[in-house]
Amino acid sequence: MSRIGKKPIALPSGVKIKVGEELEVTGPKGKLTVPIPEGITFEQADGRLEVKRASDEHAAVHGLTRALAANAVQGVSAGFVRELDIVGIGYRADVKGKIATFTLGYSHPIEVLLPEGVDLKIDKQTHLVLAGHDRQLLGQVAANIRALRKPDPYKNKGIRYTGEVLRKKVGKTGAGGK
């Protein structure tokens, strides 16, 4: 039995579930759909949602489906947040509407169009706070922004996740000045 798959999902107040071809989760932050694989069923009772599987052949997707459903429930009720830091002299970000502009040491500023459902707030031009209700989309947008200027292993300059621990490499030793 999948340990993750057999855990019930608590449904907060204000979250509505509709099971059909897909699991439709609606809440105060929006609406998400989760695909239901073959052999997986949902049972709703006492403010909880349980994921059941028809046989052990469907064990591979049992835990996955439960995790996706739990992320959808949490997303439409509380939402998700991802934070990034920009480190480097002259590196900064600005946002106007749904377009984020990054100055990252290249010869040109880089513009990123934020998808629907992802909001970006910028504190002090170097701290980004991404918020949204779809965990997968939010993580992908954060990864795309980080990929614009990954942290340099020698000076640790670039865009990193807040709290990310980076290993700094040692530079050349022979050519250093006295």
Swiss-Prot record:
It comes from Solibacter usitatus (strain Ellin6076). Pfam families: Ribosomal_L6. Keywords: Ribonucleoprotein, Ribosomal protein, RNA-binding, rRNA-binding. Belongs to the universal ribosomal protein uL6 family. This is Large ribosomal subunit protein uL6. One of its GO terms (molecular function) is rRNA binding. One of its GO terms (cellular component) is cytosolic large ribosomal subunit. The keyword Flavoprotein does not apply. This protein binds to the 23S rRNA, and is important in its secondary structure. It is located near the subunit interface in the base of the L7/L12 stalk, and near the tRNA binding site of the peptidyltransferase center.
